[in-house]
Amino acid sequence: MSWALEMADTFLDTMRVGPRTYADVRDEINKRGREDREAARTAVHDPERPLLRSPGLLPEIAPNASLGVAHRRTGGTVTDSPRNPVTR
């Protein structure tokens, strides 16, 4: 649901039910937080969305695969820090 539709729906619900209490708002925020965390867990483990997996789960990328290879953005050598270039 788009943000505008969701806000309109929330507004209409508020008008129907009346003013909400602090506890109602707190419960709604906690509920949305739980839903967001669950959606994030599902997205990480969903095989249909491989780009959302954490880097440790991608088999084709080794942790030190880029060391000693030309830097992709600048075309120069890979550096450990700007002042300490890696020479290999």
From Swiss-Prot:
GO terms for molecular function: lipid binding; molecular sequestering activity; phospholipid binding; TAP binding. This is ICP47 protein. Keywords: Early protein, Host cytoplasm, Host nucleus, Host-virus interaction, Inhibition of host adaptive immune response by virus, Inhibition of host TAP by virus, Viral immunoevasion. Residues 33-88 are annotated as: Disordered. Interacts with host TAP1 and TAP2; these interactions inhibit the loading of peptides onto MHC class I molecules. It is found in: Host cytoplasm; Host nucleus. It holds the Pfam family Herpes_US12. Changing D24G: Reduced ability to inhibit peptide-binding to TAP. Residues 76-88 have a biased composition (Polar residues). Changing R32G: Reduced ability to inhibit peptide-binding to TAP. Changing K31G: Reduced ability to inhibit peptide-binding to TAP. InterPro entries: Herpes_ICP47 (IPR008026). Residues 2-35 are annotated as: Active domain. Plays a role in the inhibition of host immune response. Binds specifically to transporters associated with antigen processing (TAP), thereby blocking peptide-binding and translocation by TAP as well as subsequent loading of peptides onto MHC class I molecules. Empty MHC I molecules are retained in the endoplasmic reticulum and ultimately directed to proteasomal degradation. In consequence, infected cells are masked for immune recognition by cytotoxic T-lymphocytes. The keyword Ribonucleoprotein does not apply.
